[in-house]
Amino acid sequence: MAAVGLSDTVTVTPAQALTVQTVPASDFPMQKNTAYRAAVAMAEHYGREANICVTIEKRIPLCAGLGGPSTDAAAVIVALAELWGIDRTDPALDDIARGIGADVPFFLHASPAFYVGGGDVLATEYPALPATPVVLVKPREASVSTIEAYRRFDEAPVPADKPGAIASAL
């Protein structure tokens, strides 16, 4: 995995209760939002109240395999760690992130890395890549959820062709 220069803007501010809003607005249930789930998981683990308002300005296309919801969850974990004075190297943060989604731990660190298992087990971390132009194309009409993509793959798995070659190139 490697991060690209495309991001949502996640703003976390103190509030009377936990709320999550997206710009543009979405009819997706707030309680299912990964940022909301991350705030709840952090509060439960650290015995705190997640009295925050999370505003997410969406720029990462949904259902494009770019980790948009996972980046938002990671941003909330980082924001609450900072707000509550929790050391960013606390291993519990990775555990909390993993409970939200397999790729959320990657977005806590965002260093190029090779993950194994369900995509949640760090095998190798690499130094930052030099700035490389990347073109991303995501047609409006074409979308597939990550869950659906993995379900389809599991129905007809294809063995990876020399994943070590990709890792060596990094």
Language model: regions and residue ranges:
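ATP-binding N-lobe of GHMP and related small-molecule kinases
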Residues: M1-A64, E82-D94, A128-P130, K138-A142
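Alpha-helical scaffold segments in soluble metabolic enzymes
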Residues: R37, A41, A79, E148, ...
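Short, small-residue alpha-helix embedded
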Residues: S70-L83
